[in-house]
Structures are given as C-alpha cells and as structure tokens.
Amino acid sequence: MSQKPHLNLIVIGHVDHGKSTLIGRLLMDRGFIDEKTVKEAEEAAKKLGKDSEKYAFLMDRLKEERERGVTINLSFMRFETRKYFFTVIDAPGHRDFVKNMITGASQADAAILVVSAKKGEYEAGMSAEGQTREHIILSKTMGINQVIVAINKMDLADTPYDEKRFKEIVDTVSKFMKSFGFDMNKVKFVPVVAPDGDNVTHKSTKMPWYNGPTLEELLDQLEIPPKPVDKPLRIPIQEVYSISGVGVVPVGRIESGVLKVGDKIVFMPVGKIGEVRSIETHHTKIDKAEPGDNIGFNVRGVEKKDVKRGDVAGSVQNPPTVADEFTAQVIVIWHPTAVGVGYTPVLHVHTASIACRVSEITSRIDPKTGKEAEKNPQFIKAGDSAIVKFKPIKELVAEKFREFPALGRFAMRDMGKTVGVGVIIDVKPRKVEVK
C-alpha cells in the first residue's frame, strides 16, 4: 500500500464518450498497466481495425476478469500520481453502475466527468435522456463536489482541436452544474484526446490555446476531505462472526467517529449494549479505529443472535436513529409504469436492505430548477425527482444525509433493477429501549 494520501475516484459520463479509453490511457502513462497487457489489447484492437480503441480494450479485459472473479493485476484500478494514491471505485459501463454509485461501499471523494466534443455525441449526453446530465445530478445528490470535466475527442470536433467548441461545452456544462448547486471553484475543465494522450499526462502540442494543467496535474490539485472523527460513532455492520475462544466479532467500516478498546457501544435497532474488547484491521490488532477503517471488533455482553448485517453500532450517548418514518428526495431512474402511494420497493441503505412503503408523495421537483413543480402528485415516473415519505416494513437504522452521508443515501430496487435513488432529508425516530 502506498504511503501517499488516498482518494477514491469515480469516472462518469455518457456511454461512448471515451471513459474507458481515458482511464486506460492514464493508467498506462502512469505505468500501472504492464506492457504485456497493453500489447494484447493493441492486437485485439488491430484485428477489429479499431486502433484507437486499445485502451478501452484494456478496461474491458479488466472488467471481464473482474466479473469472472479473476483478479488480474488489480493495480489496474489503482494508480498513483506525484501526490496521491487513487482507487477507481467503479469503472464505467458496469451494469449496476448507478446502484453502486449510491450504495458504494466507499464514498467517492472526486469524479472525472468525461464529455465528448464530437458533434451529436455531446448533444446526446446533455439531452433529457442523456447520462451526462444524469451523472451530474447523481454526483451532486451523492455529495461529490470535486469534479474534473475532461472534454474528450477534441480531434473529432467539427473543426479538430477547436477552442471555440471547447469553450461552448465549458459554458453549457458550467451553467447546468451551477443550476444544481455545484461550487464552480471546485470544478475544472481540460480538453483531451484520450487515445493520443493529449493533456492526459503530457501537454498537447495540438491545442496551443490551452495553457492550463493536464488531467494528471488536476488530479494532484484535488483536496482530501476531512475525516468525520468529531461526529458520533456509526459503524454499519457487514457481517457477524462467532469465533471460538474469542466470542462475537462484528465486521464493518467506520463511517464517522472513533472506536477505542474499552468503549461501550450500542447496536441498533436491537438496542443491545456491549463493551469493545479488541479491534482488528487487516489482521492487525489496533487500539483505536477511525472513519474509513474496515474493522472486526470483539464485543463483550452481546451474543451472535443479537446482531446482524444491516444493524449499526454507535455511541451509547448518541445512538444510531431507528426510523419510524423518513422523508427523502428521490430520483426515479426506471419503472415500467409509475410509483404511487403504497408502492413497496426494497431500499438498500448502508448495509441494510429492507422493504419500505411509500406513505406519501409530498411534491414533484423540477430537475432543472430544483424547485417544486407539483404538490402531492398522485404518482411519479421514470425521470422524475420528488419528495417522498417512506415507512420501513421492518426496523431500520437511517440518518439524515447531511449529518451521516453513508447512512442517509439509498437505492430503491424492484424486479431485479434499480428503480431509483434517494437521499434522506428528515427522519421521524422510533423510540427503542436500550438494554
């Protein structure tokens, strides 16, 4: 593991705008893909007569390997710049990309948004159905504020390498992002040609009008978000083991606060209190754990039957909230008909998956302005954004997104698909007896 500070990166943008090619090029230029793999990809691309596609082939090769569960050279999805160590959380084009983006085990610290400068492609991405728009909205909803917009395929603009086309795209994308509340000081634009590596890790000679930083230099300008150590402790439980001679060992990732040996903690929704006897991360004993740490911890006073995946451990003084009902801003991504009161999808919130009933649709939101477009609509359909109240069918820990982001965002699943995504604005707590 690198000693450099670590950032999680997500790569977003419309289909075919060159996300895979860009990441492939970046990883290769930084020496994180070996020559042999590059040669194989080059040959595969030549056979199909698509020489410029070799970097995308690299990414596809990786994806196949990942989906088959074979881990070839996983440094593939990790790379270093001069300043940082990056993990690409999710490469694009993945089936569950949107769901992963929301319930992703790790919150992305920054995004690269890839936008094609090619006529027709750019416009398709920004159309009502376009993924450029959808991914911009999702990034903001998910609390990703640092974005590098890579305007790709500059060689395929009507006038190749045209500064006017670059400025036109910067202008419209900026307006759109601004309308969703992005702080434009944290959004940077760079013109690139991914297959040739122009402005990826080296300055392009073909666009002398651009004298800003390369993509790699922009990655080094990103900021590391502060760890929420001062917030109350929250650990969504992923698994629970019972180890002979040790006892009960819940496993999870600390989302906020600090856990120390000797601490008294409470598991919700059961309301069971235990004392931390030991903490381990990657088979190493530690005395305290902080946000971002994946840990196993042994607890005295708790039995295996008391704790399960989806529960949340927290501080006794400020226990995790069990929701009687909660209000969320939801975006419907897909639904064959419409969503109305009574609809009960399964909500994936942190590590929990619980059926929740729509008890009220308060308002439909105009996605362009973020303002109310209709009060108490009867139903909402794909593409709509709305304020919705949910009633969990079983006990569920849920928090406000602005207080605990990882416990306040969710994906709605039904019929094997992601129906929508949302962030929790308000929670009506249920009283739980702590024992």
UniProtKB/Swiss-Prot annotation:
All residue ranges annotated as the tr-type G domain in the record: 4-229
Keyword Repressor: no
Residues bound to Mg(2+): 20
Source organism superkingdom: Archaea
Region (G5) location: 193-195
Keyword entries, A-Z: Cytoplasm, Elongation factor, GTP-binding, Hydrolase, Magnesium, Metal-binding, Nucleotide-binding, Protein biosynthesis
Catalytic function, reaction form: GTP + H2O = GDP + phosphate + H(+)
InterPro entries: EFTu-like_2, G_TR_CS, GTP-eEF1A_C, P-loop_NTPase, Small_GTP-bd, T_Tr_GTP-bd_dom, TRAFAC_GTPase_members, Transl_B-barrel_sf
Segments of this protein annotated with the region G4: 152-155
Major enzyme class: hydrolase
Region of interest (G1), residue spans: 13-20
Location of the protein in the cell: Cytoplasm
Entries under Gene3D superfamilies matching the protein: P-loop containing nucleotide triphosphate hydrolases (3.40.50.300), Translation factors (2.40.30.10)
GO molecular function, a single term: GTP binding
Protein EC: 3.6.5.3
Main subcellular location of this protein, as a coarse class: cytoplasm
List of residues binding GTP: 13-20, 90-94, 152-155
Reported function: GTP hydrolase that promotes the GTP-dependent binding of aminoacyl-tRNA to the A-site of ribosomes during protein biosynthesis.
Protein name: Elongation factor 1-alpha
Source organism per UniProt: Sulfolobus acidocaldarius (strain ATCC 33909 / DSM 639 / JCM 8929 / NBRC 15157 / NCIMB 11770)
